[in-house]
From Swiss-Prot:
<dbReference type="GO" id="GO:0009097">
    <property type="term" value="P:isoleucine biosynthetic process"/>
</dbReference>
<dbReference type="GO" id="GO:0005829">
    <property type="term" value="C:cytosol"/>
</dbReference>
<feature type="domain" description="KARI C-terminal knotted 1">
    <location>
        <begin position="209"/>
        <end position="345"/>
    </location>
</feature>
<feature type="active site">
    <location>
        <position position="132"/>
    </location>
</feature>
<dbReference type="InterPro" id="IPR013328">
    <property type="entry name" value="6PGD_dom2"/>
</dbReference>
<feature type="binding site">
    <location>
        <position position="394"/>
    </location>
    <ligand>
        <name>Mg(2+) 2</name>
    </ligand>
</feature>
<feature type="binding site">
    <location>
        <position position="217"/>
    </location>
    <ligand>
        <name>Mg(2+) 2</name>
    </ligand>
</feature>
<dbReference type="InterPro" id="IPR036291">
    <property type="entry name" value="NAD(P)-bd_dom_sf"/>
</dbReference>
<feature type="binding site">
    <location>
        <position position="415"/>
    </location>
    <ligand>
        <name>substrate</name>
    </ligand>
</feature>
<feature type="binding site">
    <location>
        <position position="76"/>
    </location>
    <ligand>
        <name>NADP(+)</name>
    </ligand>
</feature>
<keyword id="KW-0521">NADP</keyword>
<feature type="binding site">
    <location>
        <begin position="108"/>
        <end position="110"/>
    </location>
    <ligand>
        <name>NADP(+)</name>
    </ligand>
</feature>
<dbReference type="InterPro" id="IPR000506">
    <property type="entry name" value="KARI_C"/>
</dbReference>
<feature type="domain" description="KARI N-terminal Rossmann">
    <location>
        <begin position="14"/>
        <end position="208"/>
    </location>
</feature>
<dbReference type="InterPro" id="IPR013023">
    <property type="entry name" value="KARI"/>
</dbReference>
<feature type="binding site">
    <location>
        <position position="217"/>
    </location>
    <ligand>
        <name>Mg(2+) 1</name>
    </ligand>
</feature>
<dbReference type="InterPro" id="IPR008927">
    <property type="entry name" value="6-PGluconate_DH-like_C_sf"/>
</dbReference>
């Protein structure tokens, strides 16, 4: 199979990368009615598989899970999750032939095998769904021409898909129809109904393309969403301990600091996050962010280039063929870092404001990272709406996983594809930050408040203007207007 994106001519590539339309609420007036009465079979019962299925069932749809015979016989975790939640479970042979919609929610590396196994069993004219287009775009999977191929991609981990639904809301979602597979013209109706059933229409839906989803998703998760948080956690913890801070305090400041700081992003973007700082600290955070851009922008652009060209996917798939040797090695190395093995902060109290006051360089890393990722995507032809969701919007959700069990939890919750890309980025970013940024830090940049300095009103005005007028802030203000019912995730205590 050839990389689908690389088979397109330049005009087709630009067209697919630029597919992005924010859909009006009225387009979801029928909810998920198009799928009611139809048999929906989900293949895979991991985080996305289970939680999307729970939401869809609660929305009135007929959901069952098709698992491999050995997974059922051995009562593996996927079987246990599905059965304990009261779902019908069967083998591919038992459930696929009568399914109207088969949704493949297995890990990326399993997609080709799943397609090979289920495609011969699917009835004429059925539909096949993905929540990530890697198999179609990067592997060039060819799907039977009578089958409609759609994507509904919630922009957060599976656990949050469920939690937001239970709160009566949802998470922003990208939907798409594969242009090579829409024989009956029903693809968009299927994707819209699926998105509505998971709660996505309550938070905002972008009509996108498989190409735009994949390229922007890979960029976001490799850089700001995971790679930057991992690199930042490691270097900031090491710096705090080297400066004589209590390791337990340092651990808590980092582990819960990302979550607390990025909660402000969810409610009011980079502007609100920066406004949580004193004027002296805001100026310092802005200056540090500009320095971080100088140090890391070339790395951000390299990741974007490798994603667009297919170099990243071919490198990762070579590791798949080698039994994930690099992935497992890097995962083990992460588990041995000082931050991951730092003591628990039992009894240590940190107020919400203290996370901002004592984490100025962390705020700077978030600001710089979001803006670099957003700018790199937009410069590559990805629309601002997609770039926003794949950078700023998802960041609080990923930070929340670190608050639960540090980097281990983040890397467990994200996909293997995201984890692999995270390691590629953080392995380069960590030494750059350690060798160039950390030696530049001053008193008050990390671990204690920024000293008050005299403020030049014009300089502060210009900084505020620069923060508020960055394109990620302008589009973010528009998109957050749709999400008026957003609930707070959490703040550290």
């Amino acid at each position: 199979m050839a990389n689908y994106f690389n088979t397109l001519n330049l005009r087709e590539k630009l067209d697919q990368l630029g597919r992005c339309r924010f859909m009006d609420r009225s387009e979801f007036a029928d909810g998920c009615n198009f799928l009611k009465g139809k048999k929906i079979v989900i293949v895979g019962c991991g985080a996305q598989g289970l939680n999307q299925g729970l939401n869809m069932r609660d929305s009135g749809l007929d959901i069952a899970y098709a698992l491999r015979a050995e997974a059922i016989a051995e009562k593996r975790a996927s079987f246990t999750r599905a059965t304990e939640n009261g779902f019908k479970v069967g083998t591919y042979q038992e459930l696929i032939p009568t399914a109207d919609l088969v949704i493949n929610l297995t890990p990326d590396k399993q997609h080709s095998k799943v397609v090979a196994d289920v495609m011969p069993l699917m009835k004429q004219g059925a539909a096949f769904g993905y929540s990530h287009g890697f198999n179609i775009v990067e592997q060039g999977e060819q799907i039977r021409k009578d089958i409609t191929v759609v994507m509904t991609a919630p922009k957060c981990p599976g656990t949050e898909v469920r939690e937001e639904y239970k709160r009566g809301f949802g998470v922003p979602t990208l939907i798409a129809v594969h242009p090579e597979n829409d024989p009956k013209g029903e693809g968009m109706a299927i994707a819209k109904a699926w998105a509505s059933a998971t709660g996505g229409d309550r938070a905002g839906v972008l009509e996108s393309s498989f190409v735009a989803e994949v390229k922007s998703d890979l960029m976001g998760e490799q850089t700001i969403l995971c790679g930057m948080l991992q690199a930042g956690s490691i270097v900031c913890y090491d710096k705090l301990v080297a400066d004589g801070k209590d390791p337990a305090y340092a651990s808590k400041l980092i582990q819960y600091g990302w979550e607390t700081i990025t909660e402000a992003l969810k409610q009011g973007g980079i502007t609100l996050m920066m406004d949580r700082l004193s004027n002296s600290a805001k100026i310092r955070a802005f200056e540090l962010a500009e320095e971080i851009k100088v140090q890391l922008n070339d790395l951000y652009l390299k990741h974007m280039d490798d994603i667009i060209s297919g170099e990243f996917s071919s490198t990762m798939m070579a590791d798949w063929a080698n039994g994930d040797a690099n992935l497992f090695k890097w995962r083990e190395e992460t588990g041995k870092t000082a931050f991951e093995n730092s003591p628990k902060a039992d009894g240590i109290k940190i107020s919400e404001q203290e996370y901002f006051d004592n984490g100025v360089v962390m705020v700077a890393m978030v600001k710089a990272g979001v803006e670099m990722a957003f700018d790199a995507m937009v410069a590559s032809g990805i629309y601002e709406e997609s770039a926003y969701y794949e950078s700023l919007h998802e960041l609080p959700l990923i930070a929340n996983t670190i608050a639960r069990k540090r980097l281990y939890e983040m890397n467990v919750v994200i996909s293997d594809t995201a984890e692999y890309g995270n390691y590629l980025f953080s392995h380069v970013a960590t030494p750059i930050l350690a060798e160039k940024l950390i030696p530049m830090l001053q008193k008050g940049d990390l671990g204690e408040p920024t000293p008050t300095v005299e403020i030049d009103n014009v300089y502060l005005r210009d900084i505020n203007d620069a923060i508020r007028n960055h394109p990620v802030e302008l589009i973010g203000q528009e998109l957050r207007g749709y999400m008026t019912d957003m609930k707070r995730i959490a703040v550290g205590d």
